[in-house]
């Protein structure tokens, strides 16, 4: 019995409208479909209006042995698409779906795995949702859904015993000028009522956590894609977990029974936007996809050996769960199993940009809005920076309108352990050089304030600040030699160099390090001299380290091997001459 028929030459198919999408994605592939007789093949040819060449093909595969009639093995260029003719309409619909077209998925990349898929195993189901057995389930009074003062459920515990504190916003400043590539803001928060434990304080150079929510628009959009009625989002459910820390973040590892709603789970506990879907999650989506073609593509994406298309999903187009659901509309995963497979929505950490000991219970922080584009080209912002910008703009608007006194603006934040490198290794003596790019310069503002206010300080301070254009995005311009509300030590002055990458010299901070290598070497050679480095990306750090090695070779007369060894010594805890914070 003939079970599969192969078409050797697909060039004749290109004239058929129904096969344009197939030829587009499989230009060198043959077609295979399931038939039980020659008559069935002929009927299907007439039904689908296929060329007669299909009937004349001499290439038949044997279902039981996987061989092609007339040869020992199929041509290497052939790709077997299971039951293609049966699913021709579904394939065309998938390829014509604009959401699918926007994804960086090439069906030709999947061809080598399709005949023998090894999909990722299904993720375990750790969560169940039910209806409360009591008529009046307890209400979490901590929750606030106010757009300007949002607060998560009480079970969200990013750092026990510290709860999440609603810190009032006292002031907002825009640090960049119109025309800057990125927007950067400075927030001033009131921490006078923060419940600090005995013996704890806020450290200069420290960082604190912010618990951002997913936006209501994103939550409602996800619910729409999952076919969840909007009113169902707000119905109180019994959430049971079989172990782990979720949804508390860092609470005790144990089973839980909580009263909550899908709205609060999606808003505060599940990260479905900032990270690409894992293969485990894609496998779950494939399991609950009705359309056979969509199911096959998702299964192929979850294959252990599939790297090309999946890597593009992770690195090129910022693909999210909603993007996948839009591209594969027949996918309807169970909500409880989906929640089990989604990562926890985690807090974001921000450096303190002032000296807390001089600020009268006020913390300042700077943030740059992270922007990227969705697969279809729409602009998106990072979960936390987008959330903070919305708060900042609403605050500025209320202040402009004169309605600030009637509104409450708060940020959900918590102290954390204050054990980041800058908090542990700030020293108030000896010369220091502060090197930062972009918003990485923010924690050094507090360093300089501490030095300027210290009457006994005689150590010199050098600042190398990297930006694109000094006129547009130099942060804290004119603030580096002042201490608000305090007298400045006249003997101490910070010397600052602004490095522009798109104007002036068009150089980067590592170029300035080499150009001022004599100053850098003087700092490193001093007994108490230290260099602090802050920025984003490992490439930033590696370039600075290369520049420091060049300085050591030029001014310290060291060989390359000796400079490499010295670079490692500077970073050892016992020496602590090069302190880095990178994100």
Swiss-Prot record:
Pfam families: FAD_binding_1, NAD_binding_1. InterPro entries: CysJ-like_FAD-binding, FAD-bd_FR_type, Flavoprot_Pyr_Nucl_cyt_Rdtase, FNR_nucleotide-bd, NADPH_Cyt_P450_Rdtase_alpha, OxRdtase_FAD/NAD-bd, Riboflavin_synthase-like_b-brl. Keywords: FAD, Flavoprotein, Mitochondrion, Oxidoreductase. GO terms for molecular function: [methionine synthase] reductase (NADPH) activity; flavin adenine dinucleotide binding; FMN binding. The keyword Mitochondrion applies. GO terms for biological process: homocysteine metabolic process; methionine biosynthetic process. GO terms for cellular component: cytosol; mitochondrion. Its cofactor is FAD. Residues 162-424 form the FAD-binding FR-type domain. Its main location: mitochondrion. It is found in: Mitochondrion. Belongs to the flavoprotein pyridine nucleotide cytochrome reductase family. This is Uncharacterized FAD-binding protein C1783.01. It comes from Schizosaccharomyces pombe (strain 972 / ATCC 24843).
């Amino acid at each position: 019995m003939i079970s599969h028929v192969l078409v050797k030459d697909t060039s004749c198919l290109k004239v058929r409208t129904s096969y344009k999408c197939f030829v587009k994605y499989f230009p060198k592939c043959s077609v295979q479909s399931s038939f039980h007789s020659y008559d069935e093949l002929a009927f299907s040819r007439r039904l689908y209006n296929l060329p007669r060449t299909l009937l004349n093909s001499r290439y038949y595969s044997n279902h039981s042995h996987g061989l092609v009639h007339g040869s020992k093995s199929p041509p290497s260029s052939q790709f077997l698409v299971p039951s293609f003719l049966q699913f021709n309409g579904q394939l065309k619909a998938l390829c014509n779906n604009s959401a699918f077209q926007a994804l960086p998925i090439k069906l030709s990349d999947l061809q080598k795995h399709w005949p023998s898929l090894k999909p990722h195993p299904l993720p375990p189901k750790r969560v169940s949702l039910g209806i409360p057995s009591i008529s009046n389930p307890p209400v979490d009074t901590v929750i606030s859904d106010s757009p300007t003062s949002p607060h998560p459920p009480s079970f969200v515990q990013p750092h026990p015993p510290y709860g999440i504190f609603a810190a009032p916003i006292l002031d907002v400043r825009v640090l960049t000028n119109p025309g800057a590539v990125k927007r950067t803001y400075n927030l001033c928060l009131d921490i006078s009522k923060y419940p600090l434990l005995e013996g704890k304080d806020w450290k200069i150079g420290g960082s604190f956590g912010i618990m951002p929510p997913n936006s209501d628009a994103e939550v409602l959009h996800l619910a729409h894609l999952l076919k969840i009625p909007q009113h169902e989002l707000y119905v109180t459910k019994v959430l049971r977990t079989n172990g782990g820390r979720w949804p508390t973040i860092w609470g005790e590892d144990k089973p839980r029974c909580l009263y909550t709603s899908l709205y609060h789970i999606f808003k505060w506990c599940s990260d479905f936007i900032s990270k690409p879907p894992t293969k485990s999650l894609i496998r779950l989506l494939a399991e609950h996809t009705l359309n056979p073609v969509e199911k096959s593509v998702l299964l192929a994406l979850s294959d252990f050996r599939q790297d090309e298309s999946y890597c593009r999903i992770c690195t090129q187009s910022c693909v999210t769960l909603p993007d996948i659901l839009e591209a594969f509309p027949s996918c309807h995963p169970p909500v409880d199993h989906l929640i089990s497979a989604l990562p926890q929505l985690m807090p974001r950490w921000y450096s303190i940009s002032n000296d807390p000991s001089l600020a009268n219970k006020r913390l300042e922080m700077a943030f740059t809005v992270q922007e990227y584009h969705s697969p279809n080209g729409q602009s998106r912002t990072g979960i936390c920076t987008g959330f903070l910008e919305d708060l900042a703009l609403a605050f500025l608007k209320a202040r402009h309108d004169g309605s600030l006194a009637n509104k409450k603006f708060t940020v959900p934040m918590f102290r954390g352990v204050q054990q980041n490198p800058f908090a542990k290794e700030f020293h108030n003596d000896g010369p220091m050089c502060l090197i930062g790019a972009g918003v990485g310069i923010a924690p050094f503002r507090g360093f300089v304030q501490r030095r300027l206010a210290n009457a006994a300080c005689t150590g010199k301070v050098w600042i190398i600040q990297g930006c694109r254009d000094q006129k547009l995005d130099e942060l804290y311009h004119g603030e580096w030699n002042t201490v608000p509300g305090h007298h400045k030590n006249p003997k101490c002055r910070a010397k600052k160099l602004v490095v522009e990458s798109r104007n002036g010299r068009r150089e980067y901070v590592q170029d300035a390090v080499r150009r001022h290598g004599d100053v850098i070497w003087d700092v490193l050679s001093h007994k108490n001299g230290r260099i602090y480095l802050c920025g984003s990306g490992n490439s930033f750090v590696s370039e600075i380290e290369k520049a420091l090695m060049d300085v050591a070779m030029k001014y310290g007369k060291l060989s390359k091997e000796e400079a490499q060894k010295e670079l490692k010594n500077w970073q050892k805890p016992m020496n602590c001459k090069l302190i880095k914070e990178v994100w």
